[in-house]
From Swiss-Prot:
This is Neurosecretory protein VGF. Multiple peptides are derived from VGF, with activities in synaptic plasticity, antidepression, penile erection, autonomic activation, and increases in energy expenditure. Residues 356-378, 416-434, 578-602 have a biased composition (Basic and acidic residues). The modification Phosphoserine is found at residue 421. One of its GO terms (molecular function) is hormone activity. It comes from Bos taurus (Bovine). InterPro entries: VGF (IPR026128). The keyword Kinase does not apply. The keyword Lyase does not apply. GO terms for biological process: carbohydrate homeostasis; regulation of synaptic plasticity. Residues 26-37, 490-500 have a biased composition (Pro residues). The lineage of its organism: Eukaryota, Metazoa, Chordata, Craniata, Vertebrata. Residues 180-195 have a biased composition (Low complexity). Residues 301-332 form a coiled coil.
């Protein structure tokens, strides 16, 4: 009986080892069972039977003791994803359903299955099982006893689930995915959108709202369904719930309990295997799919831009019109002021010329007297008097121009008021027409030029110049009168050029040029001639050099007298006839004349502009 139970015990131990190592990934040779010794292959009767029993018991204890050690060293250096995939593949393998009568299972099938499984897992050696005769009844009681000693499968499942959870929690990619998920949720929750409402023109034209409010306000768009991860669609049937629980509802097997316990792990594995989709911005996913939102935004932006351009063009046109009106009014006033000043300046210039002629005659008389007196003092006095006279003349001319300018302004204001009062009186134009018929040709020309059409154009011009119509009419009439006066006036004589004034600074007295120096041949030699007071009749000096070497001391009697030394005459340059002061004054006078001519030319151009542009504008 013992000889018959021995192979069943060995087979049960082998099955326990296979179940313990079924979840181990390939490539760990340390997890494989050690090769059986020769004691298992060749059983011997008698004492050999007892020895084989002890050996089998020792193997079972060693397998039990090695299970926690192998469990600790089993998953070291293995990728969490690969480990989870291997575990799920091991779980998804369909197991053979247990027969209703467990006692009818044939030991030959178990032996063949164990041989096949062991050969595939080890990949290095096979475990030959000794051929045994099929017993009439399977060793059920022994299996139950050994099964009671085997570890509880529920504890193994709990340990495996906790291990997978730890692997998933401590994987480096899970923390990153959690951060990305939190950032995406925060971005979606706090995102706001700006929309332009084209119907309301008030401050509610542009409103800001959260994404949910915008989605509610846009009725033509339907929310898109959340995209399913396509990476894991092929693996769903493999990792789905195991069919054992549905097929065998009444029976309970370790495989069924294992599938039920690892169902949440398979769902977690789906989340691990599928890459996390990138957080897409809601406006690109919703507004990019439809054209209504884009069209609304484009229309709103186009209207805002068009309104801005129109306002800018209106502002520029108003500024340009105001600038032109200011320029025209400034030109008119400048023309009026410069025209009166010019005419009065011409009259004052005639008086100034007369006064200048009197001053010139007086100056000529004074010069004649100074020439009679002679001397250099008269030149300085003449310069000082000329400078004083010029300064007085300039001051008088300035005062006269200022007085004439103020008088002209007062007369212009009084004339404008008189013309306004006459225009307000009825029948004013009829009286002017009668006076024009009785008057000469000048009045007729005046009426012909100032016709009603011209007055209408002038009134239109006044609106552009921001001035009253009466003021513009009076200004234009004054301009016309001055123009006629200038045409009828005789040509003004060209004034003679001014003489260059005498220099104002005092010149130094003229010194007569020195006499030319005598020739060297005519000069007497110092050794030959002596002054008459020191020269003796028989005294002759030896031709010895005066200073043969430095620090040489000679007697004083031997030294020649100082009168006999050579005299060197320094030739003084003759006084130059070039007087820079007179040339500078002449140049200054010429520049003043050119400036006056340019000023007159500018006034003429201004008058022509007013006559041909402003007065003839429709």
């Amino acid at each position: 009986m013992k000889s018959l139970r021995l192979p069943a015990t060995v087979l049960f131990c082998l099955l326990l080892l296979i179940k313990g190592l079924g979840a181990a990934p390939p490539g760990h040779p340390e997890a494989q069972p050690p090769p059986p010794s020769s004691e298992h292959k060749e059983p011997v009767a008698g004492d050999a039977v007892l020895g084989s029993k002890d050996v089998s018991a020792l193997e079972v204890r060693a397998a039990r003791n090695s299970e926690p050690q192998d469990e600790g060293e089993l998953f070291q250096g293995v990728d969490p994803r690969a480990l989870a995939a291997v575990l799920l593949q091991a779980l998804d393998r369909p197991a053979s359903p247990p027969a209703p009568g467990g006692s009818q299972q044939r030991p030959e099938e178990e032996t063949a299955e164990s041989l096949l499984t062991e050969t595939v897992r080890s990949q290095t050696h096979s475990l030959p099982v000794p051929e045994t005769q099929a017993p009439a009844a399977p060793p059920r009681p022994q299996t139950q006893e050994n099964g009671a000693e085997a570890p509880d499968p529920s504890e193994e499942l709990e340990a495996l689930a906790s291990l997978l959870q730890e692997l998933r929690d401590f994987s480096p990619s899970s923390a990153k995915r959690q951060q990305e998920t939190a950032a995406a949720e925060t971005e979606t929750r706090t995102h706001t959108l700006t929309r332009v409402n084209l119907e309301s023109p008030g401050p509610e034209r542009v409103w800001r709202a959260s994404w949910g409010e915008f989605q509610a306000r846009v009725p033509e768009r339907a929310p898109l369904p959340p995209p399913a991860p396509p990476q894991f669609q092929a693996r769903v049937p493999e990792s789905g719930p195991l069919p054992e629980a549905h097929q065998f509802g009444g029976g309970s097997s370790p495989k069924t309990h294992l599938g039920e316990a690892l169902a949440p792990l398979s769902k977690a594995y789906q989340g691990l295997a599928a890459p996390f989709p990138k957080a897409r911005r809601p406006e690109t996913s919703l507004l990019g799919g439809t054209e209504a939102g884009e069209r609304l935004l484009q229309q709103g932006l186009a209207q805002v831009e068009a309104g801005r351009r129109q306002a800018e063009a209106t502002r520029q046109a108003a500024a340009q019109e105001e600038r032109l009106a200011d320029l025209a009014s400034d030109l008119l006033l400048q023309y009026l002021l410069q025209g009166g000043a010019r005419q009065r300046g011409l009259g004052g210039r005639g008086l100034q010329e007369e006064e200048g002629g009197g001053r010139e005659t007086a100056r000529q008389q004074e010069e004649a007297e100074q020439e009679r007196r002679g001397g250099e003092e008269r030149v300085g006095e003449e310069d000082e008097e000329a400078a004083e006279a010029e300064a007085e003349a300039e001051e008088a001319e300035r005062a006269r121009q200022n007085a004439l300018l103020f008088a002209e302004e007062e007369e212009g204001e009084a004339g404008a008021e008189d013309k306004r009062s006459r225009e307000e009186t009825p029948g004013h134009r009829r009286k002017e027409a009668e006076g024009a018929e009785e008057g000469g040709a000048e009045d007729e020309d005046d009426d012909e030029e100032m016709d009603p059409q011209t007055i209408d154009s002038l009134i239109e011009l006044s609106t552009k110049l921001h001035l009253p119509a009466d003021d513009v009419v009076s200004i234009i009439e004054e301009v016309e009168e001055k123009r006629k006066r200038k045409k009828n006036a005789p040509p003004e004589p060209v004034p003679p050029p001014r003489a260059a004034p005498a220099p104002t600074h005092a010149r130094s007295p003229k010194t007569p040029p020195p006499a030319p120096a005598p020739d060297r041949e005519e000069l007497p030699d110092g050794n030959e001639e002596l002054p008459p007071r020191d020269r003796x009749e028989n005294e002759v000096f030896s031709p010895v050099p005066y200073h043969p070497f430095p620090n040489y001391i000679r007697a004083r009697t031997v030294q020649p007298p100082p009168a006999s030394r050579r005299r060197h005459y320094h030739h003084a340059l003759p006084p130059s006839r070039h007087y820079p002061d007179r040339e500078a004054q002449a140049r200054r006078a010429q520049e003043e004349a050119e400036a006056e001519e340019r000023r007159l030319q500018e006034q003429e151009e201004l008058e022509n502009y007013i006559e041909h542009v402003l007065l003839r504008r429709p």
